[in-house]
Amino acid sequence: MKLVTLKDGSRDGMLAVVARDLKTAHLADGIAPTMQRALDDWNFIAPQLEELSLQLGSGRARRPFEFVPANCMAPLPRAHQWLDGSVYEQHVELLTRAFSGKLPDNLWREPMMYQGGSDDFLGPGDAAIFAEEHWGIDFEPELGVVLGDTPMQVRRDDALDHVRLLVLVNDWSLRNLIAAELGKSFGFLQSKPATGFAPLAITPDEIGEAWSGGLAHLGVAVDWNGVRFMAANAGVGTRFTFAELIAHAARTRNLRAGTIIGSGTVSSGGNVGCIAELRAREALDAADEKGKPGKARTDYMKYGDRVRIEAFDGGGSTVFGAIDQQVTSLRRRRAPGAGADEPEIAMPAALAFAQADTATSDTAAADALAQDAGTSAASALRAAIAEQVATGSAIADARADGPDALPPQAG
């Protein structure tokens, strides 16, 4: 099944199920209000979500509405844990050779992994906001797994049993801050800003045999400012699988439901996955007679640049929807009259969506918007769905209809 989190003005959004053709969606609030709630009680909740997905696909769902990716947050807008590996041989070896010169003997003895920030994930169309352009802004296309509760010391052979969902990731990196941080031998912090996600989180069965051996054998494509930068198979060129990453992360700790583990930058078959790889190749190609790397030609991203990351199945269909983000200056995002350290707070997309047509014939929805400012964003999304009812594109809001209109619960 395909799951998303819709913007409603809250931190965690509202869980919804999306049809396999990506044309319609259905709120899952009668089953689980948020993605994290579903993950917390997966064995009970997942069958109910699957039944709702089947109803949506067969036309039997009671309250479908048009699926609009722009209304999505990250599938998990904030997670208990974000752990990122680096399993692609080409990515690691290119960067190591260009910037360190020598590959250490123990490079592939065990997986590499860092713990990143997980409290402020970016949705698929959210601006990627940075304070300084000269920090070396770079994208990194990755695949990830979302886990259920995973015990400490889980065996590699059992690790994949704890995978609940697959996701597509843009692990933003600030390359010019990395060397100083790693030089302190204390890991990444400032060089790893908020991570972006595609709208859909999917169960592994959605890609069939492409989920094999602990890897997702999907095509991953990156466009930078509308020009194809990379297209590669995410299932080849790896030294480790997700099973090994999970077992590595759980060696000394439990991994709680909602933990996300990333693959590291997809890079294979000579297709560089990020700007740093391209620069590394340029530097190595310009090496002097002693083998010292020369100067790279390609600059990192600038304000106004845009990156689009998407994964495709064997038939060419999008799997997770697209990440489509624009690099934006923090200074340009400040609201007029705001204090020097106060970033602009944008209107929730759901609220803007709901207010796009104020001439609603659904007076109950309009009254709800007017009367309850404390929950205006959530009411707005519901009013928008109710507005679609008036034009024949959806069915009325469950909460307005009463408990009988809630989705049937399996079991």
Could you tell me what each predicted segment is?
Residues 1-12, 20-21, 29, 33-232, ...:
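Active-site microenvironments in enzyme catalytic cores
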Residues 8, 12-13, 175-354, 408-411:
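Catalytic-pocket segment enriched in acidic/His residues
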Residues 16:
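Short beta-strand-centered aromatic/proline hotspots
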Residues 270-271, 356, 364, 379-382, ...:
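Intrinsically disordered, low-complexity serine/threonine-rich segments
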Residues 349-368:
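Long, compositionally biased low-complexity repeat segments characteristic
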Residues 368-411:
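Long, low-complexity, intrinsically disordered segments
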